[in-house]
A protein has these predicted regions:
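Alpha-helical interface subdomain recognition
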Residues: 1-142
């Protein structure tokens, strides 16, 4: 059985932290005479990331609510873990891309966000295991 856990909310924190740090960095980093925050591509990428992070957070909340209400929730917990961990990894990777070479430097938090996010696709059941749980709920046979 898959359970809703605090680590699923931690995933939200990793992704949100990466976004917050990236927004701050892009408002200070100047390229071509203006902060890179001013470029539409930067704004659109961060807006897309924020929307995905909030969607993942809502799925975690839905799974937690189902558990609290005594409803079947294994499939919801698996979906929450899958979406939240893969969203956190994608967001962290995209944030590193936005900040450029400094994204790999230990002087900035971006490389840590990427490492912290990637491991979440592995521990407490890999993304593939979560997909197996979801497929089982959909009626897949073993």
């Amino acid at each position: 059985m898959v359970a809703v856990s605090v680590s699923q909310l931690r995933l939200y924190g990793i992704a949100q932290g990466a976004i917050n740090e990236t927004v701050a960095y892009t408002k200070e980093r100047v390229q071509f005479g203006k902060p890179i925050w001013k470029f539409q591509n930067t704004q659109f990428q961060l807006a897309d990331m924020q929307a995905k992070v909030d969607a993942a957070r809502l799925l975690v909340y839905r799974a937690a609510q189902a558990k609290q209400d005594g409803e079947p929730h294994s499939h919801l917990a698996a979906m929450a873990k899958l979406v939240a961990s893969e969203t956190a990894s994608d967001v962290a990777r995209r944030c590193v891309q936005l900040v450029g070479g400094n994204g790999y430097s230990r002087e900035y938090p971006f490389e840590r966000h990427m490492r912290d996010a990637k491991i979440t696709e592995i521990y407490e059941g890999t993304s593939e295991v979560q997909r197996m749980v979801i497929a089982g709920w959909l009626g897949a046979t073993k």
